[in-house]
Amino acid sequence: MSLLSRFFYKRPPDGLLEFADRVYVFDSCFCTEVLADSLYQIFLHEVINDLHEEFPESSFLAFNFREGEKKSVFAETLCEYDVTVLEYPRQYEGCPMLPLSLIQHFLRVCESWLARGNRQDVILLHCERGGWPLLAFILASFLIFRKVHSGERRTLEIVHREAPKGLLQLLSPLNPFPSQLRYLQYVARRNINSEWPPPERALSLDCVIIRGIPNFDSQHGCRPIIRIFGRNYSSKSGLSTEMVYSMSDKKKPLRHYRQAECDVIKIDIQCWVQGDVVLECVHMDLDPEREVMMFRVMFNTAFIRSNILMLNSDNLDILWEAKDHYPKGFRAEVLFGEVENASPQKVPTPIVNGDETGGLPIEAFSRVQELFSGVDLAENGDDAALWLLKQLAAINDAKEFTRFRHKGSFYFNSPDSEEETNTSSAADSSDEGFEAIQRPRIHIPFDNDDTDDITLSVAHESSEEPHEFSHHHHHEIPAKDSVDNPLNLPSDPPSSGDHVTLLPPPPPPPPPPLFTSTTSFSPSQPPPPPPPPPLFMSTTSFSPSQPPPPPPPPPLFTSTTSFSPSQPPPPPPLPSFSNRDPLTTLHQPINKTPPPPPPPPPPLPSRSIPPPLAQPPPPRPPPPPPPPPSSRSIPSPSAPPPPPPPPPSFGSTGNKRQAQPPPPPPPPPPTRIPAAKCAPPPPPPPPTSHSGSIRVGPPSTPPPPPPPPPKANISNAPKPPAPPPLPPSSTRLGAPPPPPPPPLSKTPAPPPPPLSKTPVPPPPPGLGRGTSSGPPPLGAKGSNAPPPPPPAGRGRASLGLGRGRGVSVPTAAPKKTALKPLHWSKVTRAAKGSLWADTQKQENQPRAPEIDISELESLFSAVSDTTAKKSTGRRGSSISKPEKVQLVDLRRANNCEIMLTKIKIPLPDMLSAVLALDSLALDIDQVENLIKFCPTKEEMELLRNYTGDKEMLGKCEQFFMELMKVPRIEAKLRVFGFKITFASQVEELKSCLNTINAATKEVKESAKLRQIMQTILTLGNALNQGTARGSAVGFKLDSLLKLSDTRARNNKMTLMHYLCKLVGEKMPELLDFANDLVHLEAASKIELKTLAEEMQAATKGLEKVEQELMASENDGAISLGFRKVLKEFLDMADEEVKTLASLYSEVGRNADSLSHYFGEDPARCPFEQVTKILTLFMKTFIKSREENEKQAEAEKKKLEKEAIKEKSATKKDGVDNDNDLIQQIHRHRT
């Protein structure tokens, strides 16, 4: 179709670029040069004349995005040709955007114009100098609205590629992509709700929180100014725009924030906004005094979810080169409130003094000057407190809460990421058709329900000037001459004949076939037809009615023919050619001539089997013929490759042979060799084919007698005696032997070759590597031991039977099972008169019984039976069962299969559970694993190009194929994961927010804490009386940490111990003030930054849910249930997040009020620092009180011991006095 479209492509008129069907853009929009008015009018005349000639029966509608409010030359010129012109402003408060109502009007006018009449009407788009950023956004909106493209960022980049590289940076000092993408998402959401756009909400913009201080001056900080532009509802029409808020209007001096001092900026605003709003943050540089734009954001209040707007540096319009000015983790939060709740509450900032809180009088500290006289408080100011706070931050960080941090970010990317695939539904057909505009004035609805609110100018000769938006040039931003282009726009402007509608890239070529079967033929020969059925190399064969043998294992020999089928007929499969077998080697001719094609099949003999004649045992073979010259090569037939041969041919002699020396006598008839004399062969390895092939003589050669025995090596090897032909084998080429047939004659089977001193036939030649040679005769090395009888049923019986045409062909030795060795002492030379010598001489004596090799192998094999069975099973399964097709990377496929084993659900049921969003069937861990193993774009393309049997694919590939049945399966899985964790995530976040609110309320409402703080203030003034630090009305919160650092002169107590002692003596009811602060310790472990990240994850998750709900509109029946469940979840989650956002906004205000309560600045002493100081003070106070109690208990015990000691001493003195008195009386009597 693309070729046909190019063939029938009609070039547009000069000066126009075809953007879509019957939609053209003036190519003057892509340049910065301005033509003179006269030349410009001539250019327009030529373009319109060409258009009328090209489309004589069409009507034309032109859109112009002008600068200023005057009627443009473009409109005046096109009016002369009966072209309807609509003009729009080129910007909205400095943003290259239009209000949402004008965007809606433009889209519906275009839809009505293109659909009316006989569908021949044409739309023209034009912008004046510098209007390309807005025109690009309008064109992208048109593509999204008409569903030409999906994905907002991708669509916008496609449009910008039509302009020269660097044009956007040249015309716009700020990157307008984020705000334009936000409004493109508004356009794409038109199908979610029946009413689009939704009603514009009136909100109260409460505050702006900036987390992470941008670096815009030499002191690594900024001095921010917030300005807000919106609709002026106080005007007569209520449609004009104005600056509704500015910090520069206030008389307060601008504060400078530095990264070293704080990391959060909170600016209270409290202004009403509705509809399209532009929020600017400007840095005021005082040296020299100038304004630098930090960021700008444009949004519509109709799409504000949950009364919160969270933005990072990628979602803000910033200067092109200012990306590195923002720290990692920078985020701007705009908090809204309902209009009925917009009245701000005054933050209580009580002055802490003795009169209000009822602390202790100064007289209560009469002993403090005595205890701490001469002891100076720490002179290093905040250093000790700051060091201690750092230690506390390292110890008491929010370890318990950080488990929420990355939970939401796993499921969703940024809402403006490049992976968006948002689509929009068909245009709303319920709107009334747009009539041809030929009047001097056109009414364009600014609101959704009023079509007569705003008047735009139509190109006509009317002298009236319609009312336009007032544009406030509120700041100037120096534009760069040369800037970097982040969009990689094309360097050359498109020609006038270029078409904007981009076709999707062609699919990549299909992957090469995984299984190729090639045969080795001479380069001069054409490829052969399919190989024939296997030939039976025997003069005897089976009856045609006999079923074919089982699938043959590949032969072990080195085959130089291409007839080595690996599957049984019918139909004959292509041979498998593999070079993996290390045992197979290539027999290369010495002259290294190119290999000829394989020989044609022998003629089909009669199906009747003549009875063979009984023949005597074969006589001794004649002497061998002279060896052929080493340089001789057998000519190749010049005939083309043969067609597929008939069914199996029977006969051991070929009909095409090279002339040979006199052959030996004919071979004996086939004999039935008992099982004791030969063992069945093991399954051979896969067949191999190399570049070598058998060279056969001319087809006209008559069939000679039976073939000669194998010749010696072509090299200078000794001439061995020619053995007689071995009994023919009834095995098929490359297949295990079937059961031996009964003898066809009643004559007894001939005995094995007689043993004599004369040389006997050697065993079949072994596997050669490079060249082939016959074995030396018996006794060549002086050995008189008899050779083993030639096995008739193992592999090839002779190289000449059914295969050789008088040519020695190398074959592989039959694979023998390794037997366990008998470790005996070998006798190499039989001594005269010994048993061994007599045994060799007595030929007529009974010989040892024949050994059953098969039984021996089964009993004494070196490999265990289980290993043999496993190997046989593997070999058999690899042949009987076709291999699985592997398209995905092996490691990824293995990991995917391991993951699937953990999901005990069939793939169709799993997909049904995903589409039904059933959290009972799949848990969050399983959903996360499914997200990790979603197919990539490359893997999906690879699977789409696969045309083979899908049953042959591996488990991972089949899993990917199932996932590909659902559109955007990864996005649906992420939505599913968000739904599973949403309830727990919201509950935990709500619990943390409630904890902060409770702790804030407890601290501010605790009367005991207030009295203790007042007591500390009085204590400090008593110590600092008469110094510069005295007569204080309050103290910084970090001063609480210095109470434990100030010691008395005797170093036995600190000021904290004295405070506890004093409170215990004077006001013991205050000692348990910690009971009023139940939630303080838990709140000290919570970081507001973490809560903000969790809140952002919830809001962004809802945005992704909404986007997927919109994108699934076009999925068809497969997503009907998914859409229904997702819509119900979205309605429920929206209310939850809205409640959560209101609670989050309240927590932010309460956290700031807590800092204000202690007279601190929230930017320098945030909520986290306040709670940690108070928690440490509370713990230190309790510890000091306990230590005081222990000290008092110890002193009490000491006093008790001293009292007992004194009492005992007094008692002893009394006893001594009594004794003295008794002695005196006794003396007196005597």
From Swiss-Prot:
List, for all copies, the residue spans of the domain called Phosphatase tensin-type: 1-194
One matching Pfam family: FH2
Q: Where is the composition biased (Low complexity)?
A: 484-496
Q: Where does the record place Basic and acidic residues bias? A: 1187-1215
Tell whether Nucleotide-binding is among the UniProt keywords.
no
Molecular functions (GO terms): actin binding; actin filament binding; microtubule binding; phosphoprotein phosphatase activity
Residues of the active site: C127 (phosphocysteine intermediate)
All copies of the FH2 domain together span 809-1207
* Pro residues: bias regions: 503-514, 524-535, 545-556, 566-575, 592-630, 637-649, 660-672, 679-688, 699-711, 718-728, 735-766
Q: Domain of life here?
A: Eukaryota
GO-annotated biological processes: actin filament bundle assembly; microsporogenesis
Output the Gene Ontology cellular-component terms.
microtubule cytoskeleton; phragmoplast; preprophase band; spindle
Signal sequence extent:
none
Spans annotated as Disordered: 412-432, 460-822, 1187-1230
Q: Which residues form the C2 tensin-type domain?
A: 200-339
- Entry keyword set: Hydrolase, Protein phosphatase
Spell out the PROSITE patterns in the cross-references.
C2_TENSIN, FH2, PPASE_TENSIN
User: Record keywords: Hydrolase included?
Assistant: yes
Give start-end positions of Polar residues composition bias. Answer: 579-591
State the similarity comment: Belongs to the formin-like family. Class-II subfamily.
Task: Enumerate the PANTHER family for this protein.
Answer: FORMIN-J, FORMIN-LIKE PROTEIN 14
Please report the name of this protein according to its UniProt entry.
Formin-like protein 14
- List the source organism: Arabidopsis thaliana (Mouse-ear cress)
Q: What lineage is on file?
A: Eukaryota, Viridiplantae, Streptophyta, Embryophyta, Tracheophyta
Q: Which gene encodes it?
A: FH14
